[in-house]
Amino acid sequence: MINQKEGFKSGFVSIIGRPNVGKSTLLNHVIGQKIAIMSDKPQTTRNKIQGVYTSEDSQIVFIDTPGIHKPKHKLGDFMMKVAQNTLKEVDLILYVVDGAEAFGPGEEFIIERLKEAKTPVILVINKIDKVHPDDLLSLIETYRHKHEFEEVVPVSALQGNNVPTLLLEITKHLSEGPQYYPSDQVTDHPERFVIAELIREKVLHLTREEIPHSIAVVIEQIKRRQHQDTVYIGATIVVERSSQKGIIIGKQGKMLKEVGQQARADIEALLGSKVFLELWVKVQKDWRNKPQHLRDYGFREDEY
C-alpha cells in the first residue's frame, strides 16, 4: 500500500446487473482502457475483473461480476457463485440497469439478492441516450419503490454522459483509506488473463450468433523477443464441437485470420509493443460441465 495525503478515500465497488446492460462498457469508460470484455451476448464477463480508478483524492477498485442469471451448467454455477460472493465482500454496489427496458422478473431476482447482501447500493440507469426523459422519470420511481438505494444516477456508459457525476457519488460513499495500487495501475489481473479476454471478445464479436459462449482461450506462451522488439503470443481457442471449430477457422482460414488481426491490435495497445500472435483451435467436448477443464481454463473461484 502507498502513503497518501490526509483525507484520501478508497474502497471496493461491485458492478452488478443483468447480462448486456452495459457493465463492462461502464468499467472500460471509467478506466479509460479495455479491461472487461464487451459483447452483445449474455454472460460475456466470467471472472471478477478488478479495474482501478485513481484520482488525487481517492482510489476506487471496481469488481465487474458476471451477469446474474439462473445457471444452466457448471460454468453457470461458477459464474453465479462469483457474483453472489462479490456482493458481500465490497463496500458499495453499483446496480446497473438498462434504461430502455421495463422493470421485470430479472430485476426482481437481483433486488432480492441485493437485500440479502445488505451492502449500500447506487442504482445506475444506463443507456439514457435511448430513453425519453418522461419514461426515465417513471422508471426511476418504479425502482425507488422496490429498494432503498443510496443514490440513483442516470448515465450513458457508451458516450460517457454523467459518468463523472457517478464517480463523485461513489467517492462520497467511501471511507478514508489507503491507496492500494500505484496511480498508473488499472487492473490487478495478469497480462495472460487480459490477453485471453481480448482474443475471446473478438471471437464472440466476429462469429455473432454462430458461436455461443462455449469457448475458452488458453494462452500457451508469451515470449518477448528483445532483438526484434516484439512479443510472441501463442494461444489456443477451445470449443465444444467440431462444427464450432470450422466456423472459427472459416473458409481458407479467413475467420481465424481476422480474429488474430483484430485481437493483435488491442493487445499491442495494451502492451505497448509489436505483437506476433499465433492462434490454434481445439475441440474439448462438453468442457463447461467438467470441473477439471474449468480449472484448466482459468475459472478458479479463489483467484478472481
Curated annotation (Swiss-Prot):
Region of interest (G5), residue spans: 155-157
Cellular component, GO annotation: cytosol; plasma membrane
InterPro entries: G_ERA_dom, GTP-bd, GTPase_Era-like, KH_dom-like_a/b, KH_dom_type_2, KH_sf_prok-type, P-loop_NTPase, Small_GTP-bd
Keyword rRNA-binding: yes
Family: Belongs to the TRAFAC class TrmE-Era-EngA-EngB-Septin-like GTPase superfamily. Era GTPase family.
Subunit (UniProt): Monomer.
Protein name: GTPase Era
Organism (species): Halalkalibacterium halodurans (strain ATCC BAA-125 / DSM 18197 / FERM 7344 / JCM 9153 / C-125) (Bacillus halodurans)
Source taxonomy: Bacteria, Bacillati, Bacillota, Bacilli, Bacillales
Gene of this entry: era
